[in-house]
Amino acid sequence: MKRTYQPSQRKRKRTHGFLARKSTPGGRKVLRNRRRTGRWRLTV
């Protein structure tokens, strides 16, 4: 059986990257909250 996690840098960046977060209202909310909690990393 094929496993569910098939890592790919391109997919990872496009789905969870900074520009992806920045481009939607929900993503901007995520960035805002992560900045507020003082995350060392905002995105992947």
Swiss-Prot record:
PROSITE patterns: RIBOSOMAL_L34 (PS00784). GO terms for biological process: translation. Residues 1-44 are annotated as: Disordered. Belongs to the bacterial ribosomal protein bL34 family. It comes from Fervidobacterium nodosum (strain ATCC 35602 / DSM 5306 / Rt17-B1). This is Large ribosomal subunit protein bL34. Keywords: Ribonucleoprotein, Ribosomal protein. It holds the Pfam family Ribosomal_L34. One of its GO terms (cellular component) is ribonucleoprotein complex. GO terms for molecular function: structural constituent of ribosome. It comes from the Bacteria. Residues 1-16, 29-44 have a biased composition (Basic residues). InterPro entries: Ribosomal_bL34 (IPR000271), Ribosomal_bL34_CS (IPR020939).
